[in-house]
């Protein structure tokens, strides 16, 4: 029987592009874990993706995950758009390269390990875990020791 995990994620970018961060809150029974990281130059969409990737990557074994995000980009991308992108060799319907392909491929690999239910919540609407993720992401984006987002392409 797979462990049931609630994973909440959010990304933030100050400037877009600019300094950015991700935040994730994981809940398993009475256990709670928070994750955050910041990057010098990135975008909000990259940080939304990174939050989901890092949250899933933290799980040491396959789990049943209920992942809640305020990003329609992430939720629709991973549940709908990615199917066509993969069939077409990672190009869009208009034959343009998929943006953030490095992170979409990383998320796809993490998703394959788990059973995931993707949920959307309106951002900044008072949802406690989403608000906490937003706080973690903004704090990370404002940090002094920001990593380089090597996959970011202007």
UniProtKB/Swiss-Prot annotation:
Residues binding Mg(2+) 1: 10, 48, 70
Protein keywords: Cytoplasm, Endonuclease, Hydrolase, Magnesium, Metal-binding, Nuclease
Keyword Hydrolase in record: yes
GO BP term, pick one: DNA replication, removal of RNA primer
Domain RNase H type-1: 1-142
GO cellular component, one term: cytoplasm
Cofactor(s), by name: Mg(2+)
Localisation per UniProt entry: Cytoplasm
The reaction(s) this protein catalyses: Endonucleolytic cleavage to 5'-phosphomonoester
EC number: 3.1.26.4
Main location class: cytoplasm
Cofactor note: Binds 1 Mg(2+) ion per subunit. May bind a second metal ion at a regulatory site, or after substrate binding.
Renumbered residue ranges of the record's region Disordered: 133-154
Family annotation (CDD domains): RNase_HI_prokaryote_like
GO terms of molecular function: magnesium ion binding; nucleic acid binding; RNA-DNA hybrid ribonuclease activity
Annotated Mg(2+) 2 binding sites: 10, 134
Family: Belongs to the RNase H family.
Xref: PANTHER family: RIBONUCLEASE H1
NCBIfam families attached to this UniProt entry: PRK00203.1
Subunit structure: Monomer.
Role of this protein: Endonuclease that specifically degrades the RNA of RNA-DNA hybrids.
HAMAP family from the UniProt entry: RNase_H
UniProt-recorded name of the protein: Ribonuclease H
Gene label: rnhA
